[in-house]
Structures are given as C-alpha cells and as structure tokens.
C-alpha cells in the first residue's frame, strides 16, 4: 500500500463467513475465485473474514444451518455457501424453518435455481458466453467433433454451458458432439469435478485419437486434459472454463472466464452497505463472464467473437427468461 493511503478501519461487528466444499479451493476453480473475491472485499472494507473447510458435505450443511440458526448480538454476518451442492440441502432446511432471514444474519447462495424468501442468491449465467464459444469453435476449419465432459448435469450452469456451446456451434455448421456425464450412475455424485488424473491417463488419449476439441465442464478435471495437451501439443483443443487457461497449454484457443471474484466483491460490498439484492444475475452483458482469446489466436478468432457477441447476449436474455 502506498504511503499515506487510507487504511480501512477494521470492523469486528461485521463478519463474512464462507463455507467451502470438502475438497477445498483447488486451482483455477470457482471456489478459488470465490476465496479471492471474499478476501479482497473484506480486506478493502475492513471486515472480518472466516473461511470454513468442512470434512464432508454433511458437515458443511450442518455448519451452514447452525450458523444461520445461531443468533448473534452486536454483530452482522453474511454467510456464503460456496458450492452448488449445498443448495438442495439449504432449500430443504429453509422449508423446515431452519434457515430464517434476520437483521443480523444473511445467507447467500451462488445458485440461480434456488428461490426462497429467507435465502439470498447470486448467479452467473453461462449460456451466452458458451454460445459465443461454440460459434467461434465452428469457424475453426480443423474442428468438426467435440467431446463434452460433464461433472453433473443437475447443475444449471453446466446444462447452460453444454446447450449454449452446441447451439452456437450449430448456428454456423452442424457439428458432432459426444457428451459424457460422470454422474450417469449416481445423480448425486460430484466426483466428476475431481478426476484430473483419470482424465490424463484414460480420457485424454482417447480424445487425441477421435476428437478435435474437448469442452470440460467438470471443475478441476480440466487439469488432466491441459496436462496432456501440454505434453502432446496438437492432440486436441481444450476450451478453458471458469478461468483463462491459455497459460497452461498452447492448444487453448479461448476460455470462458467467470469473474466470480468480482461478483463476491460486489455482493459483499452491497451487503456491507445494507443494499444486498434478494436475487441478482451477473450476465455477460455487463462483463461478469466473457470469452477470452489469447494473443496467439486473436487475429483469427477475435473478429469472429466480435461478430457474434451481440447475438449471444440477446439469446442469453431469452434463455434465462
């Protein structure tokens, strides 16, 4: 910090508590961005920040419910559930009266499907940016077939990502898409988010032989594909998801970047000023999510992305209604 800069007065009477999934925050993940945003916001505002890493989802849910139910005197708390997996449990808890909105405690969930008067929600839609990505991919002359890996189709942003990409690709030409859902056997299975080693050993070699591009809507599992394409350049293209992944492989022509860190800063700032919206959508029309094309591909792909940008925004608006 520069000499003479204003230092925010630390306020112990306002606390932000973030309950993460059992797997932690990982690399290039939504959880990592949530942590960064929460830390940056609380640090700049002088608020107390308490990250919690439970040993299991059950433990995480119990922690969330206990935090919301427990009343505090002389302190205001914003409790954030940093994983979609918590949504169903929190909805059930709210319906049973275990989650109650109060002046002292607010519960924020990053989920567009969760609606309940006692729960605040924020959501970053994925359809428009993925539509744009699919359209750009269709303009690449060496891309005809795409393997799409899905960690779990019950998550809205994953469904939006898959549908948006396919719709955008087919807008220009008909492509071949092979979709694999890790949760086919058990709809509650979330292991598909954490299979980077298996992706590197088994899935990536298959993709190298049969597919031109991989769209990994599966959290940290993407690291297995990036590692393979880095070690065997030219095997297949990988679409970056959540963060800009072009530094991890020269075969990442573009990334669908979610600025979840900025979303957290916005939500925490609004809460600290007592203006937190009950639900807010952070869309591509305002730059909360965008398609990032690295310099090595920009001369070829950026004009295509610019060409379809307005239509992608319009279609996302229709899709979200």
Q: For each predicted feature, which ranges?
A:
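Periplasmic-binding protein-like
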Residues: 18, 73-84, 108-110, 208-219, ...
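Structural motif
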Residues: 51-69, 185-205
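Hydrophobic alpha-helical segments within soluble ligand-binding/sensing domains
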Residues: 122-145, 256-276
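Extracellular/periplasmic bilobed ligand-binding domains
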Residues: 196-260
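Flexible loop/hinge segments that line or gate small-molecule binding clefts
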Residues: 100-124, 243-251
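An alpha-beta-alpha
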Residues: 38, 131-176, 278-298
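Extracytoplasmic "Venus flytrap"
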Residues: 10-11, 16-37, 41, 52-61, ...
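Hinge/cleft segment of the Venus flytrap/periplasmic-binding protein
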Residues: 266-321
């Amino acid at each position: 910090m520069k000499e003479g800069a204003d230092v925010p007065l630390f306020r112990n009477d306002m606390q932000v508590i973030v309950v993460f999934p059992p797997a932690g925050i990982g690399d290039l993940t939504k959880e990592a961005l949530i942590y960064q945003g929460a830390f940056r916001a609380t640090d700049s505002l002088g608020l107390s920040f308490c990250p919690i890493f439970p040993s299991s989802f059950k433990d995480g849910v119990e922690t969330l419910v206990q935090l919301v139910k427990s009343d505090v005197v002389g302190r205001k708390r914003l409790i954030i559930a940093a994983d979609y997996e918590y949504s169903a449990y929190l909805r059930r808890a709210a319906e049973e009266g275990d989650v109650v909105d109060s002046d002292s405690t607010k519960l924020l969930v990053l989920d567009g499907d969760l609606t309940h008067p006692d729960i605040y929600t924020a959501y970053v839609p994925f359809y428009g940016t993925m539509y744009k990505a699919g359209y750009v991919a269709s303009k690449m002359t060496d891309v005809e077939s795409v393997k799409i890996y899905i960690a779990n189709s019950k998550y809205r942003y994953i469904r939006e990502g898959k549908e948006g990409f396919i719709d955008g690709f087919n807008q220009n030409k008909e492509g071949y898409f092979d979709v694999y859902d890790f949760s086919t056997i058990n709809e509650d299975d979330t292991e598909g988010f954490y299979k980077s080693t298996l992706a590197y050993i088994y899935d990536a070699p298959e993709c190298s032989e049969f597919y031109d591009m991989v769209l990994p809507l599966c959290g940290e599992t993407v690291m297995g594909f990036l590692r393979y394409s880095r070690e065997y350049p030219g095997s297949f293209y990988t679409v970056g998801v959540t963060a800009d992944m072009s530094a991890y492989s020269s075969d990442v022509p573009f990334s669908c970047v979610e600025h979840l860190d900025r979303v957290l800063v916005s939500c925490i700032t609004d809460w600290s000023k007592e203006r937190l919206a009950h639900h807010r959508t952070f869309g591509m029309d305002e730059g909360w999510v965008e398609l990032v094309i690295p310099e090595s591909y920009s001369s070829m792909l950026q004009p295509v992305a610019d060409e379809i940008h307005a239509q992608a925004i319009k279609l996302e608006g229709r899709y979200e209604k």
